[in-house]
Amino acid sequence: MGDAAAAAPAAAAAGPSSTRGEPKDPRTIARKYQLDLCKRAVEENIIVYLGTGCGKTHIAVLLIYELGHLIRKPSREVCIFLAPTIPLVRQQAVVIASSTDFKVQCYYGNGKNSRDHQEWENDMREFEVLVMTPQILLQSLRHCFIKMNSIALLILDECHHAQPQKRHPYAQIMKEFYNSNSVEKFPRVFGMTASPIIGKGVMPSHSFTEKGGRSPCQPLIFFLPKGGSNKLNYTKCINSLEELLHAKVCSVDNEELESVVASPDMEVYFYGPVNHSNLTTICIKELDSLKLQSERMLRASLCDFKDSQKKLKSLWRLHENIIFCLQELGSFGALQAARTFLSFDGDKLDRREVDLNGSTSSFAHHYLNGATSILSRNKTDGSHAGSFDLEKLEEPFFSNKFSVLINVLSRYGLQENMKCIVFVKRITVARAISNILQNLKCLEFWKCEFLVGCHSGSKNMSRNKMDAIVQRFSSGEVNLLVATSVGEEGLDIQTCCLVVRFDLPETVASFIQSRGRARMTKSKYVVLLERENQSHEKLLNGYIAGESIMNEEIDSRTSNDMFDCLEENIYQVDNTGASISTACSVSLLHCYCDNLPRDMFFTPSPVFFYIDGIEGIICRLILPPNAAFRQADGQPCLSKDEAKRDACLKACVKLHKLGALTDFLLPGPGSRKNKVSVTNNSSNNKVEDDSLREELHEMLIPAVLKPSGLKLDSLSNLHFYYVKFIPIPEDRRYQMFGLFVINPLPVEAETLQVDLHLARGRIVKAGIKHLGKIAFEKEKMMLAHKFQEMCLKILLDRSEFTSPHVKLGNDVTLEINSTFYLLLPIKQKCYGDRFMIDWPAVERCLSSPIFKDPIDVSVHASYSSNESLRLLDGIFSKTDVVGSVVFSPHNNIFFFVDGILDEINAWSEHSGATYAEHFKERFRIELSHPEQPLLKAKQIFNLRNLLHNRLPETTESEGRELLEHFVELPPELCSLKVIGFSKDMGSSLSLLPSLMYRLENLLVAIELKDVMLSSFPEASQISASGILEALTTEKCLERISLERFEVLGDAFLKYVVGRHKFITYEGLDEGQLTRRRSDVVNNSHLYELSIRKKLQVYIRDQQFEPTQFFAPGRPCKVVCNTDVEVRLHQMDIHPDNRENCNLRCTRSHHWLHRKVIADVVESLIGAFLVEGGFKAAFAFLHWIGIDVDFNNPALYRVLDSSSINLSLMDYTDIAGLEELIGYKFKHKGLLLQAFVHPSFSQHSGGCYQRLEFLGDAVLEYVITSYLYSTYPDIKPGQITDLRSLAVGNDSLAYAAVEKSIHKHLIKDSNHLTSAISKFEMYVKLSNSEKDLLEEPACPKALGDIVESCIGAVLLDSGFNLNYVWKVMLMLLKPVLTFANMHTNPMRELRELCQCHGFELGLPKPMKADGEYHVKVEVNIKSKIIICTAANRNSKAARKFAAQETLSKLKNYGYKHRNKSLEEILIVARKRESELIGYNEDPIDVEADISVKMKSPHIHEENIPFQNTETSFTRSSKFHNQIIAGSGKHDVNNGRNNQPKLATQSGRLPSEATEKSNKKVYHGDMVHKTARSFLFELCAANYWKPPEFKLCKEEGPSHLRKFTYKVVVEIKGASATLLECHSDGKLQKKAAQEHAAQGALWCLKQLGHLPKEEDVRV
């Protein structure tokens, strides 16, 4: 869509105005006439008509300055400055920015980038002057990026292009938007031009005369002719320009300008007349013969018609350029042109190189080499261009015209400070002349360069180089430019003294502008004119006379006539205001097609057929097979161009109604090209960055554990739960404990079973059992609270016990955000299975001296020596010491005392010495009471996370018994801390924090289940443990994780959303459907849905940290509120110093990635699938806010519409294909569509791409289900890797070849056929043979048909996944064994480099000779491995290079440290596969009733739109009949049959001529010519239009007869080239009609016309 599709802002151009400096006032340097014109422009719309160099731009700057109050920010209005070329845009932006202090931004582009509404809105808010090409503004207005109401001042440079009878963007802006009734406020309009007219001007009767005896080198000074001029066109141009711009043309008296601007003297130099020499004629004949030879070779080598036509056109253009240079410049000029093409443009003219007789040259190079040889033979032997003198420059070496140019340059070249521009029409001529002039010694004083547009196709010309050349010309480094029209306007060239028109200007404006380049005083404007060429003389005369006439007409108009305005049909979208018209409909349609999915074998593009009807020309538009629909017919129009525009407008309207165009009339989401912002990163990167962003969220506290209504100072009834511990193996004793809570736990919580993982693989299975309620008196409650506080201090904060006194009962307040529960030791009653709290044990612990006030501690009781022990802090009874906690200050360690070793004391032997000696040597302690028995003690352990997925510390897979480790301690080195706190009690308490953490999480999951259950009953089908698994991330490092559920849920979500989009949006292509699905399933959207349902509070994303275990008796000390939240939880902390990032506060804050919050949605879907099936998952999706429902009629419409493909039934063996697939289709059209490649467009139906989208989605789910169920123990990442291997294009392509379904692919691309054949041959080789060959690129189409086939089965079965499951297992059986596993080599290479710390370099691919050359570099310490590969597909080339690099690294001995997938699958536990969760009721679909009809009717919808009418019912019926009567076609699967030549004689059989000029359409009598009928027949069958050629003219001039032949190219199984000749006729139309009659008769006999049809012509 041209410039509008890409408004690339050039901030550099407007850099000076980006900041406000000192005020700039452009009035200080303005001339009087500029100020006068500016004053008038402030008051009304005007068009300033001044010559080049008269300061028009400065008047515009003055106007911007005067109206600055309207655009100064914060005003929402702007000034828009339009310039028709990119150099002008850049130049004018710099001028405005340097002359004013406005914020300026300029826009231009080539369609590679695009800007959205938000970016335009931002720029309108930031900048005050926007300088752009008119196409950008036009498209921005059409798509409502910019509205006319927001423009305060509209400036149009070179505004003469705005003519109502033209479709220039200037004219369209004014016609469609300035004159629109919807515009409330119109901007001020200011136009600038050096010539207010367009075209060639008037043709005066005066002609140039050349005085006799004058040398060709002497100029003819021209004098203005008088009279005889036709002024009407000038008047119309000026009147029309004023009317369209709503402005008045204003100018300045010539006398005032003469003192300011110099006007060059004009001189005319004659050459010729042109009479080509014999040598030139011979060269032309030889070049023609060379062209024919190249054509024959090209046709013989290429079997693809489209490819050969493209190459032929390139060859013809090349030949025509060489011939033109030969005639205009001579043989040496043509030789230079050929050499230039050969060195620069070979690839441009013929991108895909094809070998010729073993040579590596392309057809273009073959022709150029031959042309160079021919032209070189005619050059004087041993001579060089630089050695020639002026006298020797004669024809045919140089043409006479070129010799005159050299004479002119020789004459003026010796003048001081001379600078010259030579204007030519063609780029080829510019380059050839420049090359020759640079090498002529006689012109060595000229330093020459050529200047052409950067869009000219020249590889060595860019905008930067253009600017550099102009800069060098201005500085004098270059003093001669050979330029095309790009030098006439848009480039600031001010110091030119001589302008030479080698070729005449084509318009008056071109004449004036090129002349205006000679701005210096005493400048010359030289025109080369051919002698005796009357048309050229009249043309030049008209240009010269036109300027005077324009001035007269501006002063006093002689007529009010104007050109008729070209009316446009417009379609407008009501809710956005976006609009399209017939002016832009063609470009918009091409833009839509350009955004359709494509591959290297197919380029989507519309095809146009024209039908010459009675009421006018009708255009039939055929869209690509992957478009939303296939055909649109326009209304009868007077010209092909208007008919084409009308058909395109109808197509665009229908595309919008089908959703393929958005409400802003742009290609819908999912277009092939990513819409990349020119100022920001891509939207994909933004979404990715957002998903990785961390946010602070609270974690939910289980409501059942909150202390609601509990008072510690009163009687309370608590629910009693017995905590069960089952050690495996039974190598430890555990004190029985009870859990006491205020509210009863949910029933599902009572089923809690947790494996607590100890060292060496040992496990304790823990659970709870409800035993009823128990009453707590006030004293008992306080006692229990103190006991729990004591236990937690010993486990987590035991450093407090190093002091002689510890106070309990400080933290007895109950916070609303905290939990309340009690963990107390229990014992079995003496009778029955009843349990009770072991209050004596509690009281005994709390009676320890450390908890008493020092002043309250009585003197130790006296014990007998046999019953007591002397400890560090006194004498204690042995019964108090055993089963207590002691502290040894000499090593700062706490111990459990498990017993007293009566037989061992300090004198006993220990490690070759006594214990006394050991303590003296090790700790320098002299024991005072060595006779005391030693204590058997066990060090108190640090509390650990027992939910951790700990790896066994030995190679044994099961836990083994582990003997406890005890030490012997002298009692006198220990101080007694807690009496009665035994080792068994400590062991139990070490398990309880992990158990309670899991219980809290389970209670949170139950709460979420209750929330969902209140909204949909299907939530009852999922267990709380399943929900908990779906809420727990891998970061928790537990034995449960959401990742497996997430993998399954992600695949299911893509399937059901893709299915919904497929059925709902029938008009969207594969790419748009993918984008629509992505909009729903992407992390950003899932995050929003999750936040809306507050799922983030349920997520568990941190591993249990025992040090941050808070419970009654150990409350959280970090009080968090809104005032300190940000300070407490800082995010911008270095990863190495993030102590506070996971700080636990009173509000349970934690940091969560957005992606994690999104992943939980998918994991919950997976959980519902596994436990509740599809129906439960659908209910959850509806609750979360994802719509996946659709109406059955929508499916029926899709099934019914598939019958359009039944016309292809003869292309393949349907029964055989169904047998290969293992499924019998009810709707055969679906099966046929699944095998139609988009390159095949010779039918009315579509291609497989939409079915491929659907099949890809369902295949991903069923493969995921297969892997999930078959391998229950493999990691989620490994499931993803295996799935990628299974559904990768290579694997699917292998499956297609193994099952031979690829032979049924319907295609029309010889390149694709060749690629498939190469791949098929490779697949069928043995492994040893494959090792010797490079694997060919896998054609994507092979994998696509497997996916589209799966999609077709899904639709035909009414979404019955059981059928899809069976077909998948059969088709992919060789793949699912994973026998020949091929991982992605690029991924494997990246992982290998990361594993070993190698630096991986991937330079950008370089394209040359039609192939991508890819390099892979790996830096191994001081050595670099470099591997390269080349392929037409860049991904394939990178794959090959990566494979070679991997091979080299493995040869060096570098391997991945982790197990490969092959090794994992060998040992993985395997179960029988199953289709997970499928309990959906399939839709009842009836058999296709039209299956017996080989030729279904095609119904074209009528398209209503503004200012147009819909008809063509007649054409649609005709199309139906043509399809119905078509003979058998065959795509040949790429086999190119040479066309048969069938020639029909000029005379027709009598039965053919007896038929009359009428054709019956279902009872309607419609008159139609045979020629028109033939055009319609070709269009209906998607053939090329018939070609009529004049064969012979005979007879005298007044009785001349014409004989025509018509050529019809019939595509199909028997490709036929039909030629029919007419009899001699007095009129050409009659001869064409007679030939068409013969063609129709032959087509009827061949079966391409219904036998029952009566065709009389």
From Swiss-Prot:
PANTHER family hit by this protein: DICER-LIKE PROTEIN 4, DICER-RELATED
Residues given in the record as ATP binding sites: 50-57
Tissues expressing this chain: Expressed in roots, leaf blades, leaf sheaths, shoot apices and spikelets.
Biological process per Gene Ontology, one example term: siRNA processing
Gene Ontology cellular component terms for the protein in this record: cytoplasm; cytoplasmic ribonucleoprotein granule; nucleus
Disordered: region residues: 1-26, 1525-1556
The protein's name: Endoribonuclease Dicer homolog 4
Function: Involved in the RNA silencing pathway. Cleaves double-stranded RNA to produce small interfering RNAs (siRNAs) which target the selective destruction of complementary RNAs. Required for the production of 21 nucleotide siRNAs. Regulates shoot apical meristem (SAM) initiation and maintenance, leaf polarization and lemma polarity through the trans-acting siRNAS (ta-siRNAs) pathway, which probably modulate the expression of the ARF2, ARF3, ARF4, ARF14 and ARF15 genes. Can process endogenous 21 nucleotide siRNAs derived from an imperfect inverted repeat.
